[in-house]
């Protein structure tokens, strides 16, 4: 119960001030009457507290009125417009005085109500307030603890009604929010309701660099219990990777491990080709993710991205200015978009990793520079792969890619690199894609790793979204990416995730005869 200071003196002051105000209004009204043309206006008295029954005052007032009526007749002939303006001003002043008095009376009555005990209805000397009512800004006071306890059953009804009203308001709000956040009604340009969504609330004040916006997410995909899982599937933390990071060596896979990785890569290629067939205007990236997930599960594998450091989906979908790691959501694809789909599969205890960038809809809707960007990215990867062999320094890959891309006036992203893959999703070596990098290591037979250059139309810098995954170009311009998983052999390199004759075309001549001998 909260103690409140004694306000009896304040109430007395309010009463005195109220009486004074009533008398002042009465006097002011008599004075104002002298300036009103009674032939044109009717005076209505709305103030209950003003007394006009005093005969002496009536006679004096009428004498004054008669004098001014004669003056008013003369004034009307000389200047009727000025007199009408004065009358309006006088009436407005009168209304103001009346309203002030009525408001003062209302305040006085409210103060009286606040000084009555909600239990016994006695006048309070000291006020004790119900803590629940006080929290909800409801005026409810009691004499003492005993009165409060004795009135609790009856007083509790106030809380019940209050809770009912709050629940109704909350349900109504949920209905409105659900409607505005539904895929069919969602407006990505209106952030008003984003605060009510666990995913979108992080973006309320975020400054986007391009046109792509986050959309609501669907629920996390379910994985059947019989599917073999990596160590992070439940905890989201890849403990085996953290242990391996303490080492600096590059793992050399044996023949049995290479065979399992090869099978995982074949499944990864089939999955990516299937995802490519789903790309079409109007299709959402969430739908692509859901079908990719079902395809992988159907083949008794686990989608490697799912719950990896809490990544919420089974593949990555990066549209237009999104560099990499875009989270599939309810955003529908549009003709003229470019989309990168990144597939990773955990199968028979090992991972595979690959991605490609596709044109959405009519290729003529894609900007010319966008087409050139995608082609440049693809061939920069393939040219670097051609040079891979035992004895080559990993840092030279970045030199080759950067040289090829620079000739086309594009730039290479520096924030992300290729990596070792196999028993671990990410391991040594680190494979940067830009020149003058400091990567360590020399290629040896049995090394399995990825090369996955991200090429930007504008500046190479990127911005991380508040979801802690999505990376976008800093200038909002387009970005493209391609990735393969590679095996260093005794004689050169094998592309484990290579395209097949059944792979859907990329929309340009990939010159497979040069790269798939």
UniProtKB/Swiss-Prot annotation:
Gene3D superfamilies attached here? Creatinase/methionine aminopeptidase superfamily
Cite the binding residues for Zn(2+) 4. 353, 419, 452, 483
Tree of life domain: Eukaryota
Activity regulation info: Inhibited by pyrimidine derivative XC11.
Q: Which UniProt keywords apply?
A: Aminopeptidase, Cytoplasm, Hydrolase, Metal-binding, Protease, Zinc, Zinc-finger
The enzyme class is: hydrolase
Site-annotated residues for Important for substrate specificity to methionine? 316
Where are the bilayer-spanning segments?
none
Q: Which InterPro entries match?
A: Creatinase/aminopeptidase-like (IPR036005), Pept_M24 (IPR000994), Pept_M24_MAP (IPR001714), Pept_M24A_MAP1 (IPR002467), Zfn-C6H2 (IPR031615)
- List the C6H2-type zinc finger ranges: 114-166
Q: Where in the cell is it found?
A: Cytoplasm
What mutagenesis or variant effect is reported for residue 316 to S? 50% reduction in activity with Zn(2+) as cofactor. Increases activity with Co(2+) as cofactor and acquires new substrate specificity to leucine, tryptophan and phenylalanine
Thermal characteristics: Optimum temperature is 37 degrees Celsius. However, has substantial activity at 25 degrees Celsius.
Residues bound to Zn(2+) 2: 130, 133, 155, 159
CDD domains the UniProt entry points to: MetAP1
> Mainly resides where?
cytoplasm
One GO cellular-component annotation of the UniProt record comes to: cytosol
Catalyses which reaction? Release of N-terminal amino acids, preferentially methionine, from peptides and arylamides
Q: What PANTHER family does UniProt report for this protein, alphabetically?
A: METHIONINE AMINOPEPTIDASE, METHIONINE AMINOPEPTIDASE 1
Q: State how it assembles.
A: Associates with the 60S ribosomal subunit of the 80S translational complex.
Task: Please give the function described in this protein's UniProt entry.
Answer: Cotranslationally removes the N-terminal methionine from nascent proteins. The N-terminal methionine is often cleaved when the second residue in the primary sequence is small and uncharged (Met-Ala-, Cys, Gly, Pro, Ser, Thr, or Val). May play an important role in parasite growth during the blood asexual stage.
- Return the protein name: Methionine aminopeptidase 1b
Instruction: Tell me what organism the protein belongs to.
Output: Plasmodium falciparum (isolate 3D7)
Taxonomy of the source species: Eukaryota, Sar, Alveolata, Apicomplexa, Aconoidasida
| Gene for this chain | METAP1b
């Amino acid at each position: 119960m909260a103690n409140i200071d004694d306000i009896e003196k304040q109430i007395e002051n309010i009463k005195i001030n109220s009486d004074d105000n009533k008398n002042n209004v009465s006097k002011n009204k008599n004075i104002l009457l002298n300036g009103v043309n009674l032939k044109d206006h009717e005076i209505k008295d709305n103030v209950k507290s003003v007394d006009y029954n005093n005969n002496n005052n009536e006679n004096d007032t009428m004498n004054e009125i008669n004098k001014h009526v004669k003056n008013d007749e003369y004034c009307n002939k000389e200047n009727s417009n000025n007199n009408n303006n004065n009358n309006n001003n006088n009436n407005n002043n009168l209304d103001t005085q009346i309203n002030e008095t009525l408001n003062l009376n209302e305040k006085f009555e409210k103060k009286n109500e606040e000084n009555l005990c909600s239990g016994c209805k006695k006048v309070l000397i000291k006020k004790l307030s119900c803590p629940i009512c006080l929290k909800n800004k409801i005026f409810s006071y009691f004499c003492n603890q005993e009165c409060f306890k004795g009135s609790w059953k009856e007083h509790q009804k106030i809380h019940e009604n209050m809770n009912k009203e709050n629940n109704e308001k909350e349900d109504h709000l949920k209905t409105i929010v659900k409607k505005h956040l539904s895929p069919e009604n969602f407006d990505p340009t209106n952030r008003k309701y984003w605060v009510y969504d666990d995913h979108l609330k992080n973006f309320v004040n975020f400054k986007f660099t391009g046109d792509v916006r986050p959309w609501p997410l669907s629920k996390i995909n379910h994985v059947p219990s019989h599917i073999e899982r990596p160590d992070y599937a439940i905890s989201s933390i890849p403990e085996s990777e953290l242990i391996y990071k303490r080492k600096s060596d590059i793992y050399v896979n044996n023949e049995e491990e290479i065979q399992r990785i090869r099978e995982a890569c074949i499944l990864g290629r089939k999955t990516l080709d299937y995802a490519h067939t789903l790309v079409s205007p109007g299709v959402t990236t969430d739908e692509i993710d859901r079908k990719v997930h079902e395809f992988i599960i159907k083949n008794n594998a686990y989608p490697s991205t799912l719950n990896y450091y809490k990544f919420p989906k089974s593949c990555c979908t990066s549209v237009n200015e999104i560099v990499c790691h875009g989270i599939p959501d309810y955003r529908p694809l549009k003709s003229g978009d470019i989309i990168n789909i990144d597939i990773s599969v955990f199968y028979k205890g090992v991972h595979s990793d690959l991605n490609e960038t596709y044109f959405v809809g009519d290729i003529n809707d894609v900007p010319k520079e966008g087409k050139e960007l995608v082609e440049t990215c693809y061939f920069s990867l393939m040219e670097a792969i051609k040079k891979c062999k035992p004895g080559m320094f990993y840092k030279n890959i970045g030199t080759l890619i950067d040289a090829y891309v620079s000739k086309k006036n594009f730039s290479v992203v520096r924030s992300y690199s290729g990596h070792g893959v196999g028993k671990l999703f990410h391991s040594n070596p680190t494979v940067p894609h830009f020149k003058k990098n400091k990567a360590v290591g020399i290629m040896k037979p049995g090394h399995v790793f990825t090369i996955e250059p991200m090429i930007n139309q504008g500046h190479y810098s990127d911005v991380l979204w508040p979801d802690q995954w999505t990376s976008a170009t800093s200038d909002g311009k387009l970005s493209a990416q391609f990735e393969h998983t590679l095996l260093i052999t005794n004689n050169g390199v094998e592309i484990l995730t290579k395209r097949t004759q059944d792979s859907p075309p990329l929309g340009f001549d990939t010159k497979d005869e040069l790269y798939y001998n």
